[in-house]
Amino acid sequence: MTTNLRKTHPLLKMINNSFIDLPTPSNISIWWNFGSLLGACLILQTITGLFLAMHYSSDISLAFSSVTHITRNVQYGWLIRNMHANGASLFFMCIYLHIGRGIYYGSYLYKETWNIGIMLLFTVMATAFMGYVLPWGQMSFWGATVITNLLSAMPYIGNTLVQWVWGGFSIDNATLTRFFTLHFLLPFSIMGLTIVHLMFLHETGSNNPTGLNSNIDKIPFHPYFSYKDALGLILMLTTLLTLTLFFPNLLGDPENFTPANPLSTPPHIKPEWYFLFAYAILRSIPNKLGGVLALLFSILILFLLPTLHTSKQRSMMFRPISQMLFWSLVADLLILTWIGAQPVEDPFIMIGQLASIMYFTILLILLPITSIIENKMLK
């Protein structure tokens, strides 16, 4: 009997063990679809980004007009540009759903996979932020000014650090050039981290909705989950194309249609929708350093989740009180997202502060205590 090439060839064997003959729990739901969707987003963003980079010019006198040139004169430039901009939104939508799934079903107990995932989140956030600066519109310029200025909150070395990042005494040509360089470079780091993420995941195998050991009931990834993932991919691409072709500027900021002007500040500086929750947490503390630390900790807190897990059960599937807290956390994040887009005035300041306190309270105090209570109820 002839041996199958995909099982013997050194390279094909790796692909086979990762995407074809991979033993997968038979009961994983649609929530396990987002990993492959994120992979698809990454590929799409890299391809569209590559074509945009061919026509973009990272000089402050040319950047804005080069983006205009792409959308007007390049063949299908408008499509590539809009797919890249809205693809970022879909990327973050998938990331947040993927992380939410991980929290709900206790996937964070695969510590290495989880930690690499958070590092991926930071890298993607940095990439998205720098990408937003590249069109050199008003919101690009002032967004970059506000966010890079946060580094000055660092004691002693703050101001030096800001000037080092800017490459001068203000945001200028050097800043735009380095942001373009890093925006081009980071996606390849993301690809590398993704491979490590998958490598650690395949050491343990996937978690499943029950949180129980599923070794007794595994099925091959292909054809079962490759087709299931294909459905998710079609739905995601449909959403992306609907956004791109019918509402291309729905998620953008109208201020970015105005070229960057250091002499005119927009009435309300705000980041893209996917950073609004963190921006609201940053603004909820009246102290600069305190705000920056809260902003950092709002993401870094994810590293603590495996340590804060006190339940005897892995998943929240059979824990109704924890479920209520989880959905309260989701609602809280939606409130923070809304507050981040509002001006700094009452009642928004107070709502933002309460929502920020609630965010940390649920994750650090309420969920661990609830898990202990649920353990006692099982006895």
Curated annotation (Swiss-Prot):
Keywords linked to the UniProt accession: Electron transport, Heme, Iron, Membrane, Metal-binding, Mitochondrion, Mitochondrion inner membrane, Respiratory chain, Transmembrane, Transmembrane helix, Transport, Ubiquinone
Binding residues annotated for a ubiquinone, in chain numbering: H202
Cofactor: heme b
Amino-acid positions noted as binding heme b b562 in the UniProt annotation, renumbered to this chain: H84, H183
Protein task: Component of the ubiquinol-cytochrome c reductase complex (complex III or cytochrome b-c1 complex) that is part of the mitochondrial respiratory chain. The b-c1 complex mediates electron transfer from ubiquinol to cytochrome c. Contributes to the generation of a proton gradient across the mitochondrial membrane that is then used for ATP synthesis.
Subunit structure: The cytochrome bc1 complex contains 3 respiratory subunits (MT-CYB, CYC1 and UQCRFS1), 2 core proteins (UQCRC1 and UQCRC2) and probably 6 low-molecular weight proteins.
The family this protein is said to belong to: Belongs to the cytochrome b family.
Name this polypeptide is given: Cytochrome b
Gene symbol of the encoding locus: MT-CYB
